[in-house]
């Protein structure tokens, strides 16, 4: 993937085909689970935080943690929340302005996550990453050690790219979007599953916003060029990712032996239904 750190060689799927195998892994079987939530799920069109969805997400993840799973949350939204905080409706083009908005928004995001998770007696930790750190062995090892210690303490890491310190000189050396970041994080923390929450309920064989006959694809065994062509265009005005970046993340996770699910983030019960084996979203098993 252009600009993304290389997968951990120890976790690639060498020797395994694209279809199910006797050792096939599903997201529902994961003990360590990475959940990625996007800006369009966390905020309204005006950029303000969707407190209901955010509270539902924190309650659901807290309950899954109580049930014995270990959770890592990759959260977009710093720039979008910063826009809402400062009353901006249009995402700026200038790198410096986006960095400033990320600095404002990240504070607000972590305040809310600390508040909502704290209501269910869970502690969160902020982890801000840059690609140049995790793409070198020493930096990668340090990040892996941090995740291991946080998870062993029962802490829920909340991860984002450190947009504030990314500069033009580092362009091409960044993650590019938080879908990619979530797949990288899944490899770093030894996850057995990646769940990407988005504003539609999976991958469709057409654009469901334009084609009422478009059908959801419940399961994708191999991410072929034909499958990638279904992903369409860019993301929302408030975020950087669209379905194409989510497919790339699923592909990167698959290369590390990690199954992925792309599901709607609109309802708090959807992760429960997914992990109980119900037919929701689109699954990418390994």
Model regions: which residues?
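Intrinsic, low-complexity polybasic segments
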Residues: 2-8, 16
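C-terminal catalytic "cap/lid" subdomain
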Residues: 8-11, 20-286
